Amino acid sequence: MRGIVTIDGPSASGKSSVARRVAAALGVPYLSSGLLYRAAAFLALRAGVDPGDEEGLLALLEGLGVRLLAQAEGNRVLADGEDLTPFLHTPEVDRVVSAVARLPGVRAWVNRRLKEVPPPFVAEGRDMGTAVFPEAAHKFYLTASPEVRAWRRARERPQAYEEVLRDLLRRDERDKAQSAPAPDALVLDTGGMTLDEVVAWVLAHIRR
């Protein structure tokens, strides 16, 4: 496979799991834009930087030399040699990552990190097919109802379903400006599908 595949969608739509599996099947790297935003949010929390302080946050990110290690089996984020990956999927990070991702300077920083990776690769996020890689050869947008997505997320986190659903609905509202399918993307509702079925559907379209 040559070129770029983008897989976008809202939170807990399955895009990360699908992108990882698709990349592995194609034998190409997998890029997680969300992991970079999560790293920025985590570092802001740990350093006591206001998540809305764009200048302070960018100085922190550049000073620590944050970088993404893109691999087919998964991504890692390093900051000054420290692997941040184990700390990035927590309720605390969930609650501030949207505020961080809305900062134009941070979005530009993430996009630069992603564009440092030479194709071919599979990139997942919210606006990979629109803002970051509009030239991608294959574009997909995965979605599902908030209830389905909250149920998926609750299985992964030590949180009650109702709390997860509330957080997810708030994040959907905050992220709606960034999360929309590209005009030429194939849109799939994954609510009634297994992971294997979604991966097979995406691969079938890529291999046509």
UniProtKB/Swiss-Prot annotation:
Residues that bind ATP, according to the entry?
A: G9, P10, S11, A12, S13, G14, K15, S16, S17
Q: Which Pfam families match?
A: Cytidylate_kin
What's its top-level EC category?
transferase
One biological process term from GO is: pyrimidine nucleotide metabolic process
Q: What is its EC number?
A: 2.7.4.25
According to the UniProt record, one GO cellular component term is: cytoplasm
InterPro entries on file: Cytidylate_kin, Cytidylate_kinase_dom, P-loop_NTPase
**By what name is this protein known?**
Cytidylate kinase
Q: Which organism is it from?
A: Thermus thermophilus (strain ATCC BAA-163 / DSM 7039 / HB27)
